[in-house]
Amino acid sequence: MPRTSALSGASSLFDLDGPMSARRIVVAMSGGVDSSVVAGLAAATGAEVIGVTLQLYDYGAATGRKGACCAGDDIRDARAVADRLGIAHYVFDHESSFREEVVERFADDYLSGRTPIPCVRCNMGPKFTDLLAMARELGADCLATGHYVRRVMGPAGPELHRAVDPARDQSYFLYGTTEEQLAFLRFPLGGLPKTETRLIAEELGLAVAAKPDSQDICFVPDGDYARVVRSVRPEGDAPGEIVHAATGEVLGTHRGIIHYTVGQRRGLEIGGQPEPLYVIGLDAPSRRVLVGPRPMLAVASATIVETNRIGPLPDAPLTAKVRSLARPVPVVLEGSFGEGASARIRFSQPEYGVAPGQAAVLYAGDRVVGGGWIDSTERWEIEG
């Protein structure tokens, strides 16, 4: 069987100067097919390759469960892949920092009426900050991951771009990558479709070639976010009132604000209303869930905080994604942007379901300009 073009030209995917035989590549290995293929591509370059896996949470109860990143079986899979490729492999216990930086923050955000994205927090902390430090300690020339994004050299240095395969693009989750980190990171899969990734895994004889993709949220085994929040913050189930945002009328009682998010319609248990009602906002101090008709979800602008900018601001129109699966929409950026500053984005058309706690990620074409956390929104006033 002839080698795939990616394997034949593997060295070009890592963009390292000098002979590859003199280079050391650390690969972040989760045990899934994507990071396993990255390890295989790295090994094909002739460089010294070291696989590193982070144990991020107590996976005992989840052992044998499919669809979770870095659970017990995944660590064993990563080790088996490393053995197959003939590379070193290390597992580091980061359970304590992961719980503090990601899981507890996840629970606190829900308690404060926000809709968190723990995968972004994880990328900002354990997956990049901690792994990069380890890679440097191991004397690596770069850290390679299985994310579907592209690192493209621009006039001012490396830029973060969307993946070639839009169905696999993960750039939304990596907006917090710093310029210093991007200089050291490599994303060999950003130019490949998922189908080719699996073909490479088969060609390399990796047992994970047909392994299902992992979930985004690894520490929620069954999708029951409320259960996870309760386990960390038992007070999350405190009941409160469901209030009509326009009239102030109390329509019912809820089971705890952790069960609700902006834009939600189902599960409100307030039947008999003259029109469909949606969650418009969450008032955490008073434990109130505010509901209203769909037009009340229309947002004109959003304030974003803790912003990160990757490279200079372009002299080009900007678009923004306010949810991971949303389409980018035109925006105008106001205020300082980057280095933790707060800014505002204004939408050219009403945007619906913009939830505090989510990320707003800015793009110029395929380039990721940066982003920040949505802190508050301004309603679009619809005339008539």
From Swiss-Prot:
Disulfide bond annotation, renumbered to this chain: C122-C218
Cell compartment(s), UniProt: Cytoplasm
Binding annotation for ATP: A28, M29, S30, G31, G32, V33, D34, S35, L54, G146
Catalytic residues (UniProt): C122, C218
Chief localization: cytoplasm
GO terms for MF: ATP binding; tRNA binding; tRNA-uridine 2-sulfurtransferase activity
Annotated region described as Interaction with tRNA, given as residue ranges: 168-170
GO CC terms, sorted: cytoplasm
Keyword annotations: ATP-binding, Cytoplasm, Disulfide bond, Nucleotide-binding, RNA-binding, Transferase, tRNA processing, tRNA-binding
Annotated site residue numbers, Interaction with tRNA: H147, Q358
EC code: 2.8.1.13
GO terms classed as biological process: tRNA wobble position uridine thiolation
Catalyzed chemical reaction(s): S-sulfanyl-L-cysteinyl-[protein] + uridine(34) in tRNA + AH2 + ATP = 2-thiouridine(34) in tRNA + L-cysteinyl-[protein] + A + AMP + diphosphate + H(+)
NADP in keyword set: no
UniProt-listed HAMAP family: tRNA_thiouridyl_MnmA
Cited PANTHER family: MITOCHONDRIAL TRNA-SPECIFIC 2-THIOURIDYLASE 1, TRNA 5-METHYLAMINOMETHYL-2-THIOURIDYLATE -METHYLTRANSFERASE
Family designation: Belongs to the MnmA/TRMU family.
Free-text function comment from the UniProt entry: Catalyzes the 2-thiolation of uridine at the wobble position (U34) of tRNA, leading to the formation of s(2)U34.
Protein's recorded name: tRNA-specific 2-thiouridylase MnmA
Organism in which the protein naturally occurs: Novosphingobium aromaticivorans (strain ATCC 700278 / DSM 12444 / CCUG 56034 / CIP 105152 / NBRC 16084 / F199)
Primary gene name: mnmA
